[in-house]
């Protein structure tokens, strides 16, 4: 049949238009790509699929969120296109809009993005009809262990025992994963990936990228959030002007929060004490007998707290287990799992509401703190759940959730306004070990790896050429980019008056940077979490001259970069590389530093031939260099001095034992009995006259015994020397790392594949580097080949 030429032309034109449109959309997405700080999980993972051109995952029509205009159910609310991310923290974190407010992998959305004008706010009725509950045969129940799952699950108790730095995991299968075609290794190497509990990661990645309604048409199911138990008064009275004072439970709770910190350095800081009293006075009331903090004596409460701590230390394992079971572990198990796509059972990362540490942190850092309000006294929690899933019952009978959403464009399960800072929000997300989070984390490090293809061009042309630019704005952008690249500074954001006075690169004040000729810059400011950043660095002469110009004619409290903010800087960075932000720089510099250090000849020589403990020390020193670059500090613990004393005592004790063993060896070599028996008791001198008849037998026995004893003593000497060397090494490492926090960079900035590959190359069990939580978080990295380079 002959085709119509007109129709052919129309089809060809339509094809060209579609191809051009898809190309523009792809370019638009590339230009708008941002770091983990700025884009939601739904955008990063499924934007391609939603736009119809993803070759990774195909999504059916049933992935779209139900329209509020067509649904017969009044409580259905169409979710906004929120810019919300999956949190990497296991604790509930405020979603601050500033870059340095969190060290997690993601930030939180603005308040204006949370509401959709087209949404109708319908609260859940106080009593839900029974017939609204789904049939057990159709819906997966989180409280039942038989809920569908695509992997073997551990109990809550096993999952939560992940805090040790060096957990022993022995029940792992041994199976080499190193490709023979890529690496030939005669020596059998331990399989790092085999030391992780079996997680079918390849299958987990098939979980649909939207949460509310999955590929199979099954909804997201979870049980909401859990509240901490109400405060139980202990009844211990504090003193005011040496007289006992009666306090209400609420007053006592805040007083106890303060009292338990009596022996910390914060008690010497006037601002901390002022913030506490400002908060406490609001609860005490104007007419309360307590009027000033100087006359307060919290010692009785502190001593009570210390006694309680000591009691817990003295408890047996069974007693501790009984107490733990008394905290309603079954109830906790109910909240710690969510079912995604009706088949994948994922752990929820942060399902508890409220902590005392939030309040204590506000006293440390905030300009205008306030004691935490009870979120659940006025239910202020919004739940996001599948359309057909059963709505979780509010924890308080008779109450209702603030709002029920069925939003498939976001990844949070619940959120509420931060009770301390109402401008910020707290979210409940899936755990860091979930398959969705694993995919996001992997993509974060892949983005940072791409920077190595751009970095030389960025340094040579993108900012170096603008150091002496006549355009002041260009010059400020160039210098700020240089500082972010070379010093791994955070970008920084503007703060409200009631927020902590912390700064980043873009918010540096004139007083934060001093110039010392010929080209030294001295930095001194409070960074994230109010950690002080102090550093003297030598910079390029043109950078030094530019900083002097930026400081000229300004007061100490004026902005150093007065023509620059974070949004302008990030917009410029995205022009240099798609998705480039200050955090990508920071992640790149941290990972590339570790990669180069563990590959350098010096560390390779130190690692060769050593035992596992020596190799771990080599890795820790490389990790330390990264932590210093990122300014990951910690205060010296109160117990540090006591630990060093105990180590010294043990070393001296071992040296005494070594001396005795060496004396024994000398006596054995001379044919004499040792000074002590094998049981450590003094050896009795032989009376030869008394045992004259048995002398010959004794001599024969002594000769045979001497050889055995010589070998035994020699072995003990070697073992004792090894113990002394290990303790000396532990002592040196503990002293060297006392002010450095290694964990933060390991969790957020170091590509785990670098560490896993290093462990494989040097026969180091991965458990020696990653604790149980990190093993679960980085399950996706365990199959990396040992020749991996960042």
UniProtKB/Swiss-Prot annotation:
Domain (Topo IB-type catalytic): residue spans on this chain: 433-790
An annotated Gene Ontology molecular function: DNA topoisomerase type I (single strand cut, ATP-independent) activity
The EC number(s) this enzyme carries: 5.6.2.1
Keyword Lyase attributed: no
Domain of life: Eukaryota
Biological process, per Gene Ontology: chromosome segregation; DNA replication; DNA topological change
PROSITE patterns linked to this entry: TOPO_IB_1, TOPO_IB_2
Cross-referenced Gene3D superfamilies: 1.10.132.10, DNA Topoisomerase I, domain 2, Topoisomerase I, Chain A, domain 3, Yeast DNA topoisomerase - domain 1
Feature: compositional bias, Polar residues: 1-18, 44-54, 61-70, 168-181
Marked site positions, Interaction with DNA: 412, 444, 502, 528, 570, 632, 650
Annotated spans, Disordered: 1-196
Subcellular localization(s) per the UniProt record: Nucleus
Cited SMART domains: TOPEUc
Biased composition (Acidic residues): 158-167
DNA-binding in keyword set: yes
Family as reported in the entry's similarity comment: Belongs to the type IB topoisomerase family.
Purpose: Releases the supercoiling and torsional tension of DNA introduced during the DNA replication and transcription by transiently cleaving and rejoining one strand of the DNA duplex. Introduces a single-strand break via transesterification at a target site in duplex DNA. The scissile phosphodiester is attacked by the catalytic tyrosine of the enzyme, resulting in the formation of a DNA-(3'-phosphotyrosyl)-enzyme intermediate and the expulsion of a 5'-OH DNA strand. The free DNA strand then rotates around the intact phosphodiester bond on the opposing strand, thus removing DNA supercoils.
Descriptive protein name: DNA topoisomerase 1
Species: Daucus carota
Gene name of this polypeptide: TOP1
